[in-house]
């Protein structure tokens, strides 16, 4: 109750009536005057002034000038009397008894001087709040009224107990604020809602029930005389806030019978409600248990809502259901008598509805600040802020805030029509009385009922009465039918009754009675519909139970088709179908009952069935949203009058969906009111009423108990655009429920606010960019990585993540009806499953790596990767395909296009597989961690420690990666789910998704790319090598990542102890280089300055690329050789050529390997350079590779050319100027760092005496370990080479290594398997163009070396730019078949050097000895090394892995090697360069003993004995191959194949590394046997690796390139290391292999690594003294002048090997594909 302008209590709103012919007297208290509001002379209600219940009078009778006439008599008077007669007002409706109605207030006489002449609004218009200015007068204090009396509800403590209440159910609303019917089931619990949050409950529809209403007498109220002490100031004004009810949902009126619009108590103590601030009141029907959310602390007057704005919070006056509904304030219920002809009361509630967006909103918004700006800001004194914090705010800001909250709402009558549930027509009351009489005629009542319902207007109460009468008639007929003895009469009477009932039901469903249904609240609508259905069913079974023979009774009316069928069981031969096509043309619905179900429910040989089909019932039986999709109710809430917070204004455009009944209702029953369960389900075919914008069909039945639709027992068999087929296991009323999507579709982004939308775009974009960078890194820098299973796994993970991010970005932009919505959901489902599967396989791969030999190997495991691909994508696609087959609509039913509908299929095909993969990944990660910790404590090899460290890092990164990805998509899922349910925490999940998704992209880039040192260097080099990048970026020192460590000393260890640190000298030049460049380089060498030697020391200047002349034609090694413009490097310097730049530097204690990148080839070229002699090693175990060149061998100091060696120069001088010749091939030189003994495997930087700098991580180098050396692994290719004519026979034995592995069968099997894998890999990986170019470089270098030796020993080498070299290069380029099929290291073949080239047939191994016209060797073989990746560290093995004594004994093994040395001493051209450790000079008796052992071997077998032809070295080669030999060869081939298969099947013990087996098992008897057979077929020499004598004679100084083994532990051999280990009794001693085995210049090629020790012993035993002597004599004869020197040098070398190791010369090249080609110089003797 508000105060008037003088501070008194606001006047009370009162109503007075006077019947026609009576006096209307209006009287106020003394001092008060009458203020009329409205008046009417006529009739608006049938109950007022109608003592006899006449229902024929008009209830729409009004005299327009009633208020004018009454004002002239009573306005501003203390009392007045007016005669209610036509003489005074006229006769607006003749024949109708009229009455005079007046609405007025008694106002104070003082108040009339300050008020306008406008009638005051009803009392619910007035509001209370802080002081306001009214009409320019002084400040007025308005005390708040008491809140309306409300029914007490569960969970509500009094009036002020709960701040806010959130409901959980609601019904949908149309765009015009219509509230479709719907029933809520269950009790809703009230929960507390924090201010500012968004409700996530569903307010129920208005629950209006029948209430007994009475009107209390109007008691005039005397206004209070209390007023403010200071009317001009607000300082002492107490203005507590008033809690008003602003609800979006209507509710029942007060249950205590008080009319809220006519009865109110004055508030005589305004201050008592001050504590009611921030309180809320819920309102609703007590019977339903529903609660309605209310709004806190809306102070309208404080908001500036003055008299001009009050109309915005009132529902306008209107006519509805023959009643006039006056202006009503929001939140109040207008109650008045029912229309004429009906008894009871009608009610209608005024609520706030969210307005529809239109162009008028802007104007409305613009007006709000203007209205609020007119309100001045009062001062706040006293304790106002204590009781009401909101009153402390300035009124202007408060007004603006309220206006912002109210701008999208408008007052609306709710529901669409008044609630006339309590209005009942008088004539139905009489029918109800008749049906309850004992002797009443039921058929007569039924006919009268059908007649009245078809002609009279019904109200809501009439619907309840009608269905009740139908129920009562069926119950009475059940008893009365027994009084009819005649069966036919009984059937006729019941049939007549049924006809009347069916007709009445059809009338109730008719369109003309739709308003009568809308008069009922939703719960009553469902109750009436249930009563109608059961009444029809009961009456139908009355007839069915009466019929005793087979019969079919059909009752067809406008809206109902009823069929009663009584069938004999013996006549039922199939299913029973209802209805027939000619009986019910309104619909094509059909129900089919199987024969089995009918027979099970028969009685007395008869089956009684009742079928019914209804029209228009679907418009009555609305779905109940608590049973089905809550989205519909949520959509209703978003568009109804829930005034909650400021964010509600933005929810008007949310996606709207509503659940509707989209088919006719069809019914079948086998028992009255029984839900009979059937053993065989029935089939229903239902036609869709609406085909556009509908989805998600659901088969439902009407539950009589719950008065709601239920899907229990029914399932959807199939559906299309127009029909759905259902299957149910019981009988009742059936229909189809479907989702109706609003035509105005919105994507997922419509629910994002502006900031979140931008952040999601940024987050996804960042993640996508980093994923693409990671993929490009794996592709462009593939040479940096091992082509292993892990690389393939991470590539697949990145691809899946990229697909997920892009599909998510596309999906949130799509609407539900978009054609791409379903496709996006399907592919997103598949991508997520595949991604989680790859994470599982990554964890499994780590586990399998730790539990197998794969720990020390990083090779491409193609079968395992293919299995991963099959399981990942195959399983994912299978699961998605099954999901599509089961229910394709699952991908289109959800609100958003990035999720499946949350049903059983979603959990079984999406959630379950993801959880399985996730749990498996976590399990394997945990197991891997346990195994890794065990191995880290037991691992002995440095290589294994390194791999364990790498695996440990991979496991950590993968685990963090998996957790991060899980958090990202869990946040995304919870955000979408929370946004769908309007949860308050949804934005939190959204921003978490944004943050973690961005972090995921950064994590991928940092931990999978940046943390890798090799990739960092590749990035820097990529920047430096691309001209389109800025020069400042390319010139950065940080972009230079690789080089060669060099120093001012010679190659090797420093000469003195003063050289404690390595130095680096640098100079640079551009290609082509002229003659003057050599001098400039020399000057630069003289002026070198010292720089500390480090891992990544750079020979080239930091800004070398900045000086690159871009216009200069790019030159390579090839062009430099052709033009002769290569710059000679200083003595002892190392040359690095990178693209068009070429730099030189001095070698220090060691060299770090340069690295390569895609698109570049790095060459270290040692052309025409002499090396300084290496000083004696200062510490044992330190052996270094140094730069070989041609001139250091061609022109040795002191004239000792033939015996000069970098490492052995001093040795030659000590023996009187006689030394072993060691050829120096001018190949590209590649250096790896080696280190001496170190503790704990730590790197030691710097140089100096006894120190070797470690090479950078990722290069091919040896890790720091005890006596670690560089280890190279030879690999072999089977190629089609150029075959020559048959040369003179020259046989040489196969040299075995110093030590063989013990287990011959095991190694043979393992190595054969390795060869098979290598062949498969070679077939898959062809030589790239860069490899072919590198092949040309290698061939060209060898041609240069051979050409220098053509003229003899003393001739200087011709310049490299001679025309002959160019012709040879062109000839080589023209031979495409040779280049494409031949190894790049097959340099022993003749290439135009006067050699007759002939194309042979079949396959030959690449490094065979070449043939020429005059005999001799065309050049020693050069070996290549193909490593899978630079990331692979060098392997180290324990000496205990090999058992010397089991393989060789001292008498045989040492003698054999001594025989070789004797042969070398006799003829260096054959064995010169073979540096074999251990033993002494072999005596002739030993040779004879070996020859005798050799002669004892069988003459011919399919094993190694096939090589008996090699024993007779002096015999002439026989070109003829007999047929018996050919047959023998074929038989042996078959046996070999079978032997290979058997070997593969043996389960032999595992070995740590296959590469070690490849290294140690060098000789392969099987290969030798097959090679000789192939030679016989091709007419070639039977000697394995035989070459022409003329070549050896032409190049007597050449010793074939060899490999050697030195353990670095004294003797320089593996045997010596093994002996030291046995002596020291140290089983943990490590042995590093850095030296392979040698052969002569015309010796055989290095065989594949699959020969067993037994086969090698057999081959060694075949050596006879005669063959050895003859071969030695032959070699001595070709070079007789050097024979004695060889013997002497050989003996001296054996003595020196006991003291120190020899330095080796290694030539190598690394191309962009990380193929390393190694060339070793001959061993010093």
UniProtKB/Swiss-Prot annotation:
A single GO cellular-component term on record: plasma membrane
Extracellular side: 1-757, 813-818, 887-910, 980-986
Region (GPS): 699-744
Polar residues bias locations: 259-282, 371-390, 1651-1666
Entry keyword set: Cell membrane, Disulfide bond, G-protein coupled receptor, Glycoprotein, Lectin, Membrane, Phosphoprotein, Receptor, Transducer, Transmembrane, Transmembrane helix
Limits of the GAIN-B domain: 551-744
Residues exposed to the Cytoplasmic side: 779-791, 840-865, 932-958, 1008-1725
Disulfide bond annotation, renumbered to this chain: 699-726, 714-728
Protein's cellular compartments: Cell membrane
Region (Disordered): 164-284, 361-390, 1056-1088, 1236-1263, 1309-1337, 1472-1555, 1636-1705
Keyword check for Transmembrane helix: yes
Domain called SUEL-type lectin: residue spans: 18-107
UniProt subunit comment: Forms a heterodimer, consisting of a large extracellular region non-covalently linked to a seven-transmembrane moiety.
Descriptive protein name: Latrophilin Cirl
Species per Swiss-Prot/TrEMBL record: Drosophila mojavensis
